[in-house]
């Protein structure tokens, strides 16, 4: 099950991240998770939000370059090495992981957001391995 991630390209300058977040606030888009990757010139903000299309539209209207991408949210079992075991399943099928970042949804369980070169293949591997993922419907209830 894929979930939509909102990505925003932002200039790497003081206050720019706050401007993006203010646009989302005005649009009543709730942020569930985010990560920022930066270079000297620009940053890439990746967000899991309650309404990615609404967020994208609000940001585009305000002049921010943004897009929506399919990602997988994996529910991590609570034992040492659980993420390592999941990554071994993915690697065994030669699926490249583009990036990952954490997501905490209820304070008890951990999850990770994963973007792969082949999202459908990664989903199939996870499903076959009995690994729980989060649907967009589950995410919407948070």
Which residue ranges define each predicted feature?
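A conserved regulatory-domain signal marking ACT and ACT-like small-molecule sensing domains
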Residues: 1-142
């Amino acid at each position: 099950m894929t979930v939509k991630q909102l990505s925003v390209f932002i200039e790497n300058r003081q206050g720019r991240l706050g401007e993006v977040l203010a646009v989302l606030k005005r649009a009543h888009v709730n942020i569930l998770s985010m990560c920022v990757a930066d270079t000297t010139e620009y940053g890439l903000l990746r967000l899991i939000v309650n309404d990615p299309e609404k967020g994208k539209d609000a940001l585009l209207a305000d002049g921010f370059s943004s897009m929506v991408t399919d990602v997988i949210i994996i529910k991590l079992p609570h034992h040492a090495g659980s993420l390592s075991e999941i990554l071994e399943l993915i690697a065994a099928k030669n699926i490249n992981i583009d990036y990952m970042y954490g997501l905490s949804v209820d304070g008890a369980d951990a999850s990770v957001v994963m973007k792969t070169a082949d999202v459908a293949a990664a989903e199939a591997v996870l499903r076959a391995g009995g690994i729980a993922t989060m649907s967009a419907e589950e995410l919407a209830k948070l």
